C-alpha cells in the first residue's frame, strides 16, 4: 500500500494554499488527498466504513478552512467597500470643487469680457487686443469639447445627483475617462490662462492710464508736489503689485510643495496599506502553517496510535506480519535516535545562546557600572583628562571672545541709543510727512476740481467757437465765391491794362522817331528857305513834341512872355532834350521790378527838376532868332491874335482847373495807396482801390483827349500868326507850353509811378489771392482741428471719468494708508514697550556680565595652567594612541583566530554528528545480519534522500542555483508564488530565474 499512498501523497504541499492560489487550484481537476493507513481490513463493508469516516473527517477540515476563508474574504470585502466608498467620496468632492472652479472661472471671464467690451467701445479699432496674446482664440465654455455627453456627465452641475458621476465613471473605460479628463484639464488651464491674460490686460490698461495721467500732468499746469506724489503713488502701486505677484508665486510654490507632500503622504499611506496587506498575508500564512502544524500533530497522534496498535498486533499475532512490524519498529528507533541527536544539538545551541546571553548581561552590567563611575568621577581625574585641558583652552578662547563681545555690547548699546533716537526722529518725520501728504492730497483734490472746472469752461468755449466757426464758414461760402469771381475779373482787366500800356509805349516810340525825322527836315528847310518861312516852320514843328508828350499847357501871363522872349529855336532844343530824357525813363520803367516801382517813381520827381532847369538855361543859346521874318506879318494878324488870345486864356483857365482836379485826384490816389499798404489786406479795400484806379485812368484818358484837341487847335491857329506880337505871343505860348510840358512830364512820371503801383497792386492782389488760398487751407485745417478737438474732448471726458474713478480709488487707498499708519503706530508703541523691557533685561545682563567678567578674570589664571597641563597630556595621548594603533592589529588577528576556531569547532561538531550517524549505521549492519534487509534499509534511505524534504511525498526535481539545494518543483513554485522566496534549509533568497528543473535517472 506504499505505492498508492505515495501517489496520493503528491497533494500534500497543496493543502491549505494561500488566497492568491485559490483560483488556480479551483481550475485543477484532481483533488489531492493525503495518504492514510487503514490498517487491517477484513471486508469491503469495513473498508467502505473507514473510507467514509476518513472522508467525513476531511470534509469537516475543509469546511472549517472554508469558513475561515469566508470570514477573511468577508472582512476584506468590507475593507474594500469602505475603501471604494472613500474613493467615491473623494472623487465626488474633487468633481464638485472642479466644477465650482470652472463656473467661477467662467463667471470671471464673462465679467472681464463685458468690461473689455465696455472699455474697448470708445477706443480705436486698431488698439483692441484679441482674447489671447498669440491671436488664437480660446474655445468658449459652452462651445468647446465639453459639450460631449460623456464629459457633461463627468462635469455635472451641483444640483445633479452624485450617482450620475459614479455611473459615468463605471460606464466608460479608463482610456475614455483619461481622455475626457485631459480635455477638461486643458479647458481649465485655458480658462485660467485667459483670466491671467485679462488681469495682465487690466494691469497694462492701468499703466497706460497712469502714463496718460503723467502726460496730462506734464501738459497741464499742475504743481510739482502733486506730480511727485502721483509718481510716488504709482511706484508704491507697482511695488505692491510686484509684492502681490511674488506672494502669489510663493503661495503657488508652497501649494505645489504641499501637494507634493500630500502625494508623498498618500503614497506613504498606500505603502502602509500595502504593508498591512502583506502583514495580513503573512498572518494568513502563519495561520496556514499553524493549521498545518495542527494537522501534522493530528497525524502524529494517529501515527502514535497506529504504532501502539502495531505493537499490540505484533504481540498478539504470530509471524503473519512480523517482518513489517519489526521494520517499523526499527524506523521508529531511528527516528528516536535522530530526535535525540537533534535534541542534543538544540541543547548545545541553547547552551551557547545562554552563554552569549550571560556574556551580554555581563557587558551590560559593566557598561552600567562604567556609566555610574563616569557620573561620579573625582575632580583630579577630570582635571588630568585631555578633554578637560581642551575645554580649558577653549575657555580661554571663549574668554577672549567674551571680551570682544563685551566691547561689541557697548557698541550695540550706543547703536541702540542712536537707533532709538533715529527711530523717534523717524516717527516724527513720518507724522510730519503724513500731515504734509494729507495737505498735499487736499490741495491736489482742490486743484483737480479747479482743473475740472477749467476744462469744462474750455470745453464750452471751444463748443461756442466751433459753432461760430461753422456759422461763419456757412456765411463766408457765397462771399468767397463772389470774391473769387471778382478777383478773376480784376486779373483779366489788369492783363488788358498791361497790354494797353505796352501798346502805348510802342506808339510813343514810333511818334518819337517821327518827331526826330520832322526835326531833321525842319532844320534842313530852315537853312534853305527865306526868313519868312521860319516862324511857320517853327510854329508847325513846335507843337509836335507837345502832341507826343501828351498835349500843350496853358498860355503864360504877359510877365512870362517877357522873360521867355529870347530865340524861338528853344522849342526844338527842349523837345530834343525831352526826347532824350524819355528814352532812358522808359528803359528805367522797364527795368524796375514790381517791388521797387513805388520808390523809384517817387524818386524821379526831384531828379526831373534840375534837368528842366538845365534845359531852360541851355534853351536860349541853341536855336537862331526868327524875329525879322515875323515883323512883316504882325499887323495882319493882330485882330485874329486878340481873339485867339481870349479863347486861349479861357481855355487855359479850364485846363488849369482840370489840372488842379487831376492833382487832387492824384493825391487821393496816393493816400489810397498808402492806406492800402498800411491797412490789412481785405477784400473790400481792394475793391475800392480798383474802383479808384479805374476812375483815375478815366480822368487821365479825358485829359489826354483834351490835350490832343488843344494841340490840334493850337497847330491850326499857329499857322495864322505872322507878326511880332504873334511871335511874342507864340513865344510866350511856347514858354507856357514848355511849362505845361514840364508839368505834363511830371504828370507822366506820376502816371508811370501810378502804373508801377498798379503793377505792385496787381502783384499784391496775386499775393492776396495766394493768401486767400492759404487762408482757405487754414480754414480746412481749422475744421480738421475742430473735429480733432471734439474727438479729444470726448476722450478727455472718458479720461475724466477714469480719473474720477482713480480718485475714488486713491481715496480708498488713502484710507487704507491711514489704517496702515495707525497699525504702524500701534506696532511702534509695542516696539517701544519691547524696547523698555529689553533695556531692563539689558541692565540685568550687564550686571551678570560684570559678575561673569570677574569670574573670567579669576579663571584666567587657571586657564593658563590648564593649557600647560593640556599640552603635557596631549603628548601622553599621542603616545597612548601610537600604542593603541600597534595593539589594534593584534586584536584583529586574535579576533579572526577566535572566529576561525569557532568555525572549526562547528565543523568538528558536524563531523562528529556525521560520524555518529555512520556509527549507528554500522551498528545497524551489525544488528541486521541479513544482507537483503540491509539493502532494503539503504534503499529506503536513498529514497528518503531523493524525496523532497518539504513535503516528503514528491521526488526532488528542482534545484536552487543560489545555494544548489534540491527540492520538488511544486514546493519551490508554491514558495515563490506565496512570496516565501527563501531556501528552506539555508534561508538564501532566490528569484524567478534562480530555480530550474532537474531529472535524476
From Swiss-Prot:
GO biological process per UniProt: chromatin organization; positive regulation of transcription by RNA polymerase II; protein ubiquitination; ubiquitin-dependent protein catabolic process
Gene Ontology MF terms: mRNA 3'-UTR binding; protein homodimerization activity; ubiquitin protein ligase activity; ubiquitin protein ligase binding; zinc ion binding
EC number: 2.3.2.27
Intracellular or extracellular location(s): Nucleus
Modified residues (Phosphoserine): 42, 528, 585
Presence of keyword Zinc-finger: yes
InterPro entries: E3_ubiquit_lig_Bre1, Znf_C3HC4_RING-type, Znf_RING, Znf_RING/FYVE/PHD, Znf_RING_CS
Family: Belongs to the BRE1 family.
Effect of residue 113 to Q: Abolishes interaction with RB1
Record text on subunit structure and interactions: Component of the RNF20/40 complex (also known as BRE1 complex) probably composed of 2 copies of RNF20/BRE1A and 2 copies of RNF40/BRE1B. Interacts with UBE2E1/UBCH6. Interacts with RB1 and WAC.
UniProt note on tissues of expression: Ubiquitously expressed. Expressed at higher level in testis, heart and pancreas, while it is only weakly expressed in lung, skeletal muscle and small intestine.
Modification type N6-acetyllysine: residues: 20, 355, 517
Function: Component of the RNF20/40 E3 ubiquitin-protein ligase complex that mediates monoubiquitination of 'Lys-120' of histone H2B (H2BK120ub1). H2BK120ub1 gives a specific tag for epigenetic transcriptional activation and is also prerequisite for histone H3 'Lys-4' and 'Lys-79' methylation (H3K4me and H3K79me, respectively). It thereby plays a central role in histone code and gene regulation. The RNF20/40 complex forms a H2B ubiquitin ligase complex in cooperation with the E2 enzyme UBE2A or UBE2B; reports about the cooperation with UBE2E1/UBCH are contradictory. (Microbial infection) Promotes the human herpesvirus 8 (KSHV) lytic cycle by inducing the expression of lytic viral genes including the latency switch gene RTA/ORF50.
Full protein name: E3 ubiquitin-protein ligase BRE1B
Catalytic activity: S-ubiquitinyl-[E2 ubiquitin-conjugating enzyme]-L-cysteine + [acceptor protein]-L-lysine = [E2 ubiquitin-conjugating enzyme]-L-cysteine + N(6)-ubiquitinyl-[acceptor protein]-L-lysine
Residues forming coiled coils: 44-91, 189-377, 437-525, 627-946
Alphabetical list of PROSITE patterns matching this protein: ZF_RING_1, ZF_RING_2
Biased composition (Basic and acidic residues): 18-28, 602-619, 633-652
Amino acid at each position: 500500500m506504499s505505492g498508492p499512498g505515495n501517489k496520493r501523497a503528491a497533494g500534500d504541499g497543496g493543502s491549505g494554499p494561500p488566497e492568491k492560489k485559490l483560483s488556480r487550484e479551483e481550475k485543477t481537476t484532481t483533488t489531492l488527498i493525503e495518504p492514510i493507513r487503514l490498517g487491517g481490513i477484513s471486508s469491503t463493508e469495513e473498508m467502505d466504513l473507514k473510507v467514509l469516516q476518513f472522508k467525513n473527517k476531511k470534509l469537516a477540515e475543509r469546511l472549517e478552512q472554508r469558513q475561515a476563508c469566508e470570514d477573511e474574504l468577508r472582512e476584506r470585502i468590507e475593507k474594500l467597500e469602505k475603501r471604494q466608498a472613500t474613493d467615491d467620496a473623494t472623487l465626488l468632492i474633487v468633481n464638485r470643487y472642479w466644477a465650482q472652479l470652472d463656473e467661477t472661472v467662467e463667471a470671471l471671464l464673462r465679467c472681464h469680457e463685458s468690461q473689455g467690451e465696455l472699455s474697448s467701445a470708445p477706443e480705436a479699432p486698431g488698439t483692441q487686443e484679441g482674447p489671447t496674446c498669440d491671436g488664437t482664440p480660446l474655445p468658449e465654455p459652452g462651445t468647446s469639447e465639453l459639450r460631449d455627453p460623456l464629459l457633461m456627465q463627468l462635469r455635472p452641475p451641483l444640483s445633479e445627483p452624485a450617482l450620475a458621476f459614479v455611473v459615468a465613471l463605471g460606464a466608460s473605460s479608463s482610456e475614455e475617462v483619461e481622455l475626457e479628463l485631459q480635455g477638461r484639464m486643458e479647458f481649465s488651464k485655458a480658462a485660467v490662462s485667459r483670466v491671467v491674460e485679462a488681469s495682465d490686460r487690466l494691469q497694462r490698461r492701468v499703466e497706460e492710464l497712469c502714463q496718460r495721467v503723467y502726460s496730462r500732468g506734464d501738459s497741464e499746469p499742475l504743481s510739482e508736489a502733486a506730480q511727485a506724489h502721483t509718481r510716488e503713488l504709482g511706484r508704491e502701486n507697482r511695488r505692491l503689485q510686484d509684492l502681490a505677484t511674488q506672494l502669489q508665486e510663493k503661495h503657488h510654490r508652497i501649494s505645489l510643495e504641499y501637494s507634493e507632500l500630500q502625494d508623498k503622504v498618500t503614497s506613504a499611506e498606500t505603502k502602509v496599506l500595502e504593508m498591512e496587506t502583506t502583514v495580513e498575508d503573512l498572518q494568513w500564512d502563519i495561520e496556514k502553517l499553524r493549521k498545518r502544524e495542527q494537522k501534522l500533530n493530528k497525524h502524529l497522534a494517529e501515527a502514535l496510535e497506529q504504532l501502539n496498535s502495531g505493537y499490540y498486533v505484533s504481540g498478539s499475532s504470530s509471524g503473519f506480519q512480523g517482518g513489517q512490524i519489526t521494520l517499523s519498529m526499527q524506523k521508529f528507533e531511528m527516528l528516536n535516535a535522530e530526535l535525540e541527536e537533534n535534541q542534543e544539538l538544540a541543547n548545545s545551541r541553547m547552551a551557547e545562546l545562554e552563554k552569549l546571553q550571560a556574556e551580554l548581561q555581563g557587558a551590560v552590567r559593566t557598561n552600567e557600572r562604567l556609566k555610574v563611575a563616569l557620573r561620579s568621577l573625582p575632580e583630579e581625574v577630570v582635571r588630568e583628562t585631555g578633554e578637560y585641558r581642551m575645554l580649558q583652552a577653549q575657555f580661554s578662547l571663549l574668554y577672549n571672545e567674551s571680551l570682544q563681545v563685551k566691547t561689541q555690547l557697548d557698541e550695540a548699546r550706543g547703536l541702540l541709543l542712536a537707533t532709538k533716537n533715529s527711530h523717534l526722529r523717524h516717527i516724527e518725520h513720518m507724522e510730519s510727512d503724513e500731515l504734509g501728504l494729507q495737505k498735499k492730497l487736499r490741495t491736489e483734490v482742490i486743484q483737480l476740481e479747479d482743473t475740472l472746472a477749467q476744462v469744462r469752461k474750455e470745453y464750452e468755449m471751444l463748443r461756442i467757437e466751433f459753432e461760430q466757426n461753422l456759422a461763419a464758414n456757412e456765411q463766408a461760402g457765397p462771399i468767397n465765391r463772389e470774391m473769387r469771381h471778382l478777383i478773376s475779373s480784376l486779373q483779366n482787366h489788369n492783363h488788358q491794362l498791361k497790354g494797353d500800356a505796352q501798346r502805348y509805349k510802342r506808339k510813343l516810340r514810333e511818334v518819337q522817331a517821327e518827331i526826330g525825322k520832322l526835326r531833321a527836315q525842319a532844320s534842313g528847310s530852315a537853312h534853305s528857305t527865306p526868313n519868312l518861312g521860319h516862324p511857320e516852320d517853327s510854329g508847325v514843328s513846335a507843337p509836335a513834341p507837345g502832341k507826343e508828350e501828351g498835349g500843350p499847357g496853358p498860355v503864360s501871363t504877359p510877365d512870362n512872355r517877357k522873360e521867355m522872349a529870347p530865340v524861338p529855336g528853344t522849342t526844338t532844343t527842349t523837345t530834343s532834350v525831352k526826347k532824350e530824357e524819355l528814352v532812358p525813363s522808359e528803359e528805367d520803367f522797364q527795368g524796375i521790378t514790381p517791388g521797387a516801382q513805388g520808390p523809384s517813381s517817387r524818386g524821379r520827381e526831384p531828379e526831373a527838376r534840375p534837368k528842366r532847369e538845365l534845359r531852360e538855361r541851355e534853351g536860349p543859346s541853341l536855336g537862331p532868332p526868327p524875329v525879322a521874318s515875323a515883323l512883316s506879318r504882325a499887323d495882319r494878324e493882330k485882330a485874329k491874335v486878340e481873339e485867339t488870345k481870349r479863347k486861349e486864356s479861357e481855355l487855359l483857365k479850364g485846363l488849369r482847373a482840370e489840372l488842379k482836379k487831376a492833382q487832387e485826384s492824384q493825391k487821393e490816389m496816393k493816400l489810397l495807396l498808402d492806406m492800402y499798404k498800411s491797412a490789412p489786406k481785405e477784400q473790400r479795400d481792394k475793391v475800392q482801390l480798383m474802383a479808384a484806379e479805374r476812375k483815375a485812368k478815366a480822368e487821365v484818358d479825358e485829359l489826354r483827349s483834351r490835350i490832343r484837341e488843344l494841340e490840334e487847335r493850337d497847330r491850326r491857329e499857329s499857322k495864322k500868326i505872322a507878326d511880332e506880337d504873334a511871335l511874342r505871343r507864340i513865344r510866350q505860348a511856347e514858354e507856357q507850353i514848355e511849362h505845361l510840358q514840364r508839368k505834363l512830364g511830371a504828370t507822366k512820371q506820376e502816371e508811370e509811378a501810378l502804373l508801377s503801383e498798379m503793377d505792385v497792386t496787381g502783384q499784391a492782389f496775386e499775393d492776396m489771392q495766394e493768401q486767400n488760398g492759404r487762408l482757405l487751407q487754414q480754414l480746412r485745417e481749422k475744421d480738421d482741428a475742430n473735429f480733432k478737438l471734439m474727438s479729444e474732448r470726448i476722450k478727455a471726458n472718458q479720461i475724466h471719468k477714469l480719473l474720477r474713478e482713480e480718485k475714488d480709488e486713491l481715496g480708498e487707498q488713502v484710507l487704507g494708508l491711514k489704517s496702515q499708519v495707525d497699525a504702524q503706530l500701534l506696532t511702534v508703541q509695542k516696539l517701544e514697550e519691547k524696547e523698555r523691557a529689553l533695556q531692563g533685561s539689558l541692565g540685568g545682563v550687564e550686571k551678570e556680565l560684570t559678575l561673569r567678567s570677574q569670574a573670567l578674570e579669576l579663571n584666567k589664571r587657571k586657564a593658563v595652567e590648564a593649557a600647560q597641563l593640556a599640552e603635557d597630556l596631549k603628548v601622553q595621548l599621542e603616545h597612548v594612541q601610537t600604542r593603541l594603533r600597534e595593539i589594534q592589529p593584534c586584536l584583529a588577528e586574535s579576533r579572526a583566530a577566535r572566529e576561525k576556531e569557532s568555525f572549526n569547532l562547528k565543523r568538528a561538531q558536524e563531523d562528529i554528528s556525521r560520524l555518529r550517524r555512520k556509527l549507528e549505521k554500522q551498528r545497524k549492519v551489525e544488528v541486521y545480519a541479513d544482507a537483503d534487509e540491509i539493502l532494503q534499509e539503504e534503499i529506503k534511505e536513498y529514497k528518503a534522500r531523493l524525496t523532497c524534504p518539504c513535503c516528503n511525498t514528491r521526488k526532488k526535481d528542482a534545484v536552487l542555483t543560489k545555494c544548489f539545494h534540491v527540492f520538488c518543483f511544486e514546493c519551490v513554485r508554491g514558495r515563490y508564488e506565496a512570496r516565501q522566496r527563501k531556501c528552506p534549509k539555508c534561508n538564501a533568497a532566490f528569484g524567478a530565474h534562480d530555480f530550474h528543473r532537474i531529472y535524476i535517472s
